[in-house]
């Protein structure tokens, strides 16, 4: 049963925020990402952009909330983390022995939780190898570090930062390596408002470990920990499984999950929730 949005922050002492797609929004980085994939991996940017728009718009065989299996080029639909349908890239159902089984970590699947992972899936589908994908990702992150105002939308950030003093401890956790994200974090002013920023944390498993550490380090109960993020698999699922509170920033209207998290369409809706909890 979903939590009451008006009390989601009541009694919370520790807050953990995701970075990409949470504290900034928008997909202004996508054209640069596709250009890099063309340069490093030969991806057709116009074809890729068309497919990406369909994926993010919910009118493609692969949708936000699905998992893509690059080994078989198949799409796995698992709304409750048990596979109920497998399709090809274009959405045609196929027989697959995995139907009815659960989803686990470390299976080489790409969870489509945001535009970053949607681009990754499109590239893999069209044969861009992992090395070219990695080089493209690194190049676009470097570009973001020097052109964040042009590529990212941080218009809703300041009101959220203004509400953080209510928490005894707050930190940012991101899977992006420090050398690729530290300049962006600094330009957003996050070190001034968070006690720590952790890079390359290997979510979702890294978040599971960090929650365990936080419970002991700050002598808090799970109900006194709040996590805010946009990627359900990486940010929200580990949080609710640990019994903590969660705000899911879901701009794509992903297929509903019967979970206890509060879901919002964008970062602008987060600040009022933090304010209401006082």
Predicted regions and their residues:
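Short, acidic loop-to-helix structural element flanking the phosphoryl-transfer center
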Residues: 11, 16, 112-113, 145-171
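Active-site neighborhood of HAD-like aspartate-dependent phosphohydrolases
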Residues: 2-54, 60-67
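Asp-based, Mg2+/Mn2+-dependent phosphohydrolase catalytic module
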Residues: 1-13, 158-162, 171-278
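Catalytic-loop motifs flanking and including active-site residues across diverse enzymes
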Residues: 29, 115, 210
């Amino acid at each position: 049963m979903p939590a009451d949005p008006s009390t989601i922050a009541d009694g919370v002492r520790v807050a953990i925020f995701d970075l990409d797609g949470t504290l900034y929004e928008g997909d202004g980085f996508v054209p640069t990402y596709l250009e890099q994939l063309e340069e490093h991996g030969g991806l057709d940017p116009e074809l890729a952009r068309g497919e990406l728009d369909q994926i993010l718009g919910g009118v493609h065989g692969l949708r936000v909330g699905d998992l893509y299996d690059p080994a078989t080029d198949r799409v796995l639909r698992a709304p409750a983390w048990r596979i109920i349908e497998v399709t090809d890239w274009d959405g045609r159902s196929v027989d697959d022995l995995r139907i009815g089984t659960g989803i686990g970590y470390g299976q080489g699947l790409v969870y489509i939780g945001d535009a970053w992972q949607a681009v990754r899936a499109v590239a893999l589908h069209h044969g861009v190898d992992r090395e070219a994908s990695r080089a493209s990702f690194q190049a676009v992150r470097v570009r973001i570090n020097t052109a964040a105002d042009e590529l990212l939308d941080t218009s809703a950030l300041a009101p959220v930062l203004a509400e953080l003093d209510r928490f005894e401890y707050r930190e940012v956790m991101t899977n992006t390596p420090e050398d690729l994200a530290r300049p962006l974090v600094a330009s957003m002013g996050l070190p001034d408002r968070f006690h720590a920023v952790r890079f390359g944390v290997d979510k979702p498993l890294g978040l599971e470990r960090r929650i365990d550490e936080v419970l002991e380090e700050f002598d808090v109960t799970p109900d006194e920990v709040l996590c805010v993020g946009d990627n359900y698999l990486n940010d929200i699922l580990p949080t609710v499984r640990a019994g903590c509170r969660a705000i899911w920033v879901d701009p794509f209207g992903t297929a509903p999950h019967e979970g206890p998290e509060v879901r919002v369409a964008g970062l602008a809706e987060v600040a009022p929730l933090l304010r209401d909890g006082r």
